[in-house]
């Protein structure tokens, strides 16, 4: 088969981009490195242009390679989805469900839920991925896999082609460790942050908070020094080590620490506006019984959890 028409060769190409290594891509796809190298050379020969700049074992995408990657990933995703639909019986409670979640909530909340669901339906298999882009783009992983279900936040804009199940409101808590507050004092107003270190979270699915509200008032945030991290786990680790103040820690990630007072709320009610939390599914995926049953089940489970948080921390829902 012509390499241009061979999707397995294109999948090898995307795997090399993802792993940044021909050998790692070969291992992932169970291909001999020599064969993988030959397939890649054949593909470039048929294209008439290089996909990679080769420097020893290092491979860097050419500008054409970047363009090819962006165009082929959706094609491979559609191919994978078509195969799954052809293989699967929509009415049966068996088969795979591919799930994507916000970084950080998987180990604490989602993994236990998947295990619980598999006890009820042992023929269901799960793949859990980390959300790397806002929805709906986030349904497709960097490897080109299309996910069935996503758990995350939603603004007011509707998502076309997406089924949504509301779970609850997520408050964001400005907080710091007692260790930090004992050394640096307690900020009571956003203006006080000029004397403090801000631990700021910036990721593919959220930007760093630069403004807080309190009732009808709002105020910009400015810090003496900043520590920027790219996921909630790193932010929480820095927070507990006394590195500074997180102005927007989701209550989900700090409720236990607030209970045992290893984290203390600051800024006297100033906060980032809360966000609505949802379980999402692509309409095509939701048409499968296993996906619809799972989505409705986990959405109800998440709602119970959010209701418990609201009852225990009513002060953050005013």
Could you say what each language-model-derived stretch is?
Residues 95-159:
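Central regulatory/effector-binding core of bacterial HTH transcription factors
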Residues 44-63:
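A short LG(V/I)-centered, amphipathic sequence patch enriched
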Residues 32, 39-42, 113:
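Residues within the DNA-recognition helix of helix-turn-helix
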Residues 219-265, 272:
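Hydrophobic hinge/microswitch elements
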Residues 1-3, 70, 123, 251-260, ...:
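C-terminal effector-binding regulatory domain of bacterial HTH transcription factors
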Residues 130-207, 211-228:
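Acidic, Gly/Pro-rich loop/turn segments at junctions of secondary structure
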Residues 14-30:
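Short helix-boundary/capping micro-motifs
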Residues 56-59, 66, 77-100:
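Short helix-loop hinge/linker segments at domain boundaries
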């Amino acid at each position: 088969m012509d390499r241009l028409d061979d999707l397995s060769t294109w999948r090898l190409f995307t795997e090399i981009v993802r792993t940044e290594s021909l050998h790692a891509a070969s291992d992932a796809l169970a291909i001999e490195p020599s064969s993988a190298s030959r397939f890649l050379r054949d593909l470039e020969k048929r294209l008439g242009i290089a996909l990679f700049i080769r420097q020893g074992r290092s491979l860097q995408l050419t500008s054409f390679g970047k363009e090819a990657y962006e165009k082929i990933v959706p094609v491979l995703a559609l191919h994978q989805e078509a195969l799954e639909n052809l293989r699967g019986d929509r009415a049966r409670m068996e088969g795979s469900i591919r799930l994507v979640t916000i970084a950080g909530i998987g180990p604490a909340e989602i993994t236990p839920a998947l295990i619980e669901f598999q006890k009820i339906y042992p023929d269901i298999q799960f793949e859990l991925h980390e959300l790397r882009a806002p929805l709906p783009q986030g349904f497709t992983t960097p490897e080109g896999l299309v996910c069935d279900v996503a758990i995350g936040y939603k603004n007011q804009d509707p998502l076309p082609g997406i089924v949504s199940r509301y779970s609850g409101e997520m408050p964001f808590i400005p907080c710091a460790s007692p260790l930090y507050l004992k050394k640096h004092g307690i900020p009571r107003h956003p203006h006080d942050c000029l004397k403090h270190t801000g631990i700021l979270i910036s990721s593919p699915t959220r930007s760093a908070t630069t403004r807080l509200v309190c009732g009808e008032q709002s105020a910009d945030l400015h810090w003496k020094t900043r520590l920027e991290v790219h996921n909630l786990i790193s932010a929480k680790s820095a927070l507990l080590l006394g590195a500074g103040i997180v102005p927007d820690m989701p209550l989900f990630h700090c409720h236990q620490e607030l209970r045992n007072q290893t984290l203390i709320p600051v800024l006297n009610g100033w906060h980032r506006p809360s966000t609505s939390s949802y379980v999402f599914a692509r309409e095509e995926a939701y048409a499968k019984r296993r996906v619809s049953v799972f989505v409705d089940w986990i959405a109800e489970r998440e709602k119970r959890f959010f209701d418990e948080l609201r009852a225990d921390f009513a002060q953050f829902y005013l």
